[in-house]
Amino acid sequence: LGAVSIAFIGMDHPEDMLLANNKYYTLAIVLIIYWLATFISLKGLSWVGKVAKIGGMVGTIIPAALLIILGIVYLATGGHSNMDFHSNFFPDFSKFDNLVLAASIFLFYAGMEMGGIHVKDVDNPSKNYPKAVFIGALITVVIFVLGTFALGIIIPEKDINLTQSLLVGFDNYFKYIHASWLSPIIAIALAFGVLAGVLTWVAGPSKGIFAVGKAGYLPPFFQKTNKIGVQKNILYIQGAAVTLLSLLFVVMPSVQSFYQILSQLTVILYLIMYMLMFSGAIALRYKMKKAGRPFRIGKGGNGLMWLIGGLGFCGSLLAFVLSFIPPSQISTGNNTVWFAVLFIGVIVVVAAPFIIYASKKASWVDPNTEFEPFHWEVKNDVSETNTTKA
């Protein structure tokens, strides 16, 4: 989206669309935005917080609200809808091809659980945090559903494009209200929003890896920081990995196909974690019956937990399986490349935590680490202490 937004800053939209479809241009912009986000992250969390806050408002919330309002105004003033709200309103889920794209819906909610790290900063978290999650999920549904309708209304079905439709939709609406001069402005805003989003993902996970490394799970090389305490080596390695992954642009047939395969890989990795979360929540009801739970699903018994956790697990499992199937709506090129990228990506990412956990060394532990031990490690320490005393 960042590359497309920058391409659409110009006023010659046919040329803008050609530029946005150029794989090498997109590769260059992706790397520029990512490394810019990396260098901003090296400035510390204060910089990250400021850019993310402003970018989230200017590049996400305001454009989303504007898009929905433009769609309402367009229909209210007699604009022609390119979207059929009758016979073809509901997709044909009997076709696997449609289910594959539907599986991407899980990505809309990805990261909702990340707010849990701030739960200690919330007043009365046992009540207010679940409320915040439900409200956030509702807002997400409203924005994505209404935003998608707004794009479907103004763009003919044959012209729908995974990477360009948002900018094309805004451009068409601005032409309708005779305000085409707003197109470059919204393109700049969206590009800034992309930078803010990338910045959040660059800084957040690397901070978590840094905390794990200081607990003795990574060599001292990964624990090195700059003058203000930012995990510089992890950020550089992370950037190098993204750079290598971006080279997929060269082997994929189009920008759309590259976007789709990365989206599918992201969905698959998220769903693996969600399946572990749902199954883990059920298992802990039996393995840690007496654990204190400020928030509990179901007042008594485990029936409601089985229902909610089971539905979540089954839905995630179905989407997980479907995500490996190439969609027919988008040319993904050689199926061998498609499956190879997905399977190798999953194997590497899933294997990494096990390798890191098995590699822990006492000599790697930073004395100032605040990393909490795993509960089974605490149990083992207690057992060893009791055995020694006996």
Question: Model-predicted segments: where are they?
Answer:
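C-terminal membrane-solvent junction of multi-pass transporters and transport-like membrane proteins
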Residues: 22-25, 37, 51-54, 224-228, ...
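TM-loop-TM module centered on a large, flexible mid-protein loop between adjacent transmembrane helices
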Residues: 2-11, 132-199, 218-266
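Alpha-helical transmembrane segments and their membrane-interface junctions
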Residues: 241-253, 315-332
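Membrane-interface loop-to-helix entry segments
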Residues: 25-77, 110, 133-139, 263, ...
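Terminal cytosolic tails of multi-pass membrane transporters
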Residues: 278-307, 326-390
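Hydrophobic, small-residue-rich membrane helices and short re-entrant helix-turn-helix hairpins
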Residues: 43-54, 112-147, 206-209, 213-228, ...
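Helix-loop-helix junctions that connect adjacent transmembrane segments
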Residues: 8-25, 54-187
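Membrane-helix boundary/coupling elements in multi-pass transport proteins
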Residues: 109, 114-122, 180-220, 228, ...
